[in-house]
């Protein structure tokens, strides 16, 4: 097999927050593919970096009273620790705030300028007079010009999905200072993506098929997944627009040459260029020559460049990035693989539900990172579909597959080999056992008596990123191995010394099956595979070991004493994990306030008691201090949806928008409101009420309603209030 030379990247995590389980989908997906390629002895270089520039980093550093570089250095170490904890095997992890990256950015800019693909234009922007800075789109909020939802970002509406210019917002305000922004003009630099040269290049590049590489069981490969190519075609058909690549000072980033330090490269220009900066720094550290660097970064070399990204950044990677590279003298990506998002238990990750889980928290709670690597692999395919982390399925699948099927083979057979046969395996097996072994090694291919080596089928699935199919095939082989052990019953054979030859044979064959499964699973479970190699007394396994003509280990091969390889997941561990990650919008309330809220909650979910004749309302409850009242976190919420609850006489199920997330609340207002009346309405909710498990689901708060025999009457804020606002 000829060696491939591949530069592989994952999208750069932003140096302004923690790595969470959603991020890990991409890094685990990439790492599995890289490890598989390396097991085939291809030359693969997996590089990444922290995306370390931009306004959010500048502002956060200011809030913390440190410099941006102090912030990004701290976050770099946090990210690297998280990635190491999940066995993400970067060959190099760097930062975009580097001299290499700056040199690449400036060179690309100069080449595009020389090719007349940079334009200078005056643009009108919002300016914060308090902070004395132009505001990025995401730091401007206001009322959507289409649906009039409040508290929407300056570039798109999360309520109706509309996109618009920040200057289109109604009643805009600065998310940095709260001030009303001013409109000011400034000269900006644009990459002319609308140029006919860019359009012609992209139309050809996007739909171009790539010749198969040596050792890949595909005649040609598409550059993009079909759904990604279709999306690109939509954007091309709508017409390409020029891309603003500059930002005004103050800004944390690289200054644009010949602008006197007043203009900076937009973070989205220098971020993908960071792939090149990281790669060059890595090769320099390993004393590689400029010619070797150019082989990967310049056109004409027999190398590949493969990007793994989330589907939300496809526009940047499949339009701007290749066009910039093509017209600045650099090589373009060979392939771009986009993946979907992660949901947890069928819903978006949520801090209130404890499902917005950081990598650090997962590891600190003592959960095995390879449990998650395996589960993601069992769910991932080659499409851009979202994947769901169902905790119930997570526990069941890991316990069944990894412990019950894979590790179980070794634990059931190793002891007999070490105790009765000095730890030595036999190569002499009966025809019956050889048939079992062949059934393990080969899988049916279509109809009839056509068979394919299972290692070839699994390899093809790994290559195409169809990991779920690879896992299914591997577990099918594991089923054969366990059926063999169950049929031969070594624990019964061991009771009579006259069965020693057969016992030796059965346990040796089973451990050879375990060895093959270890080869298959090694890209997914690198640490477990290493421990299995040590137990089996083997050098690091490669894919050749799955393809060997001598698939049984030699006669007399010695194994080591078996050590426990993996534990089962206890469901209580998941409960502790979600509990540790639950976060209210405000600190927990006191017991006195909890009792007050409980009383309010009862009143909101039942018909209020009628007032006595002649009374305007019910008597006041016992007093509480202003400090205790302040512990109740009241927030403005927008009702996104309302629906009847089957089997409930008084409840409506409300989906609420509180700006930072969505909440589900069951409210006892069915007698007074039709669901259709409530959609789009603003109300007030208790946001830090502990989630309560009800017969119909989990209620994540409580809406406020008044009543003294009539009603209930849902409380609504005055005009101008926006979702997420705190009621004071």
Swiss-Prot record:
This is Methionine--tRNA ligase. Its cofactor is Zn(2+). It is found in: Cytoplasm. It holds the Pfam family tRNA_bind. Residues 628-728 form the tRNA-binding domain. A motif ('HIGH' region) lies at residues 13-23. Zn(2+) binds at residues 144, 147, 157, 160. Its EC number is 6.1.1.10. A motif ('KMSKS' region) lies at residues 348-352. Keywords: Aminoacyl-tRNA synthetase, ATP-binding, Cytoplasm, Ligase, Metal-binding, Nucleotide-binding, Protein biosynthesis, RNA-binding, tRNA-binding, Zinc. ATP binds at residue 351. Homodimer. One of its GO terms (molecular function) is tRNA binding.
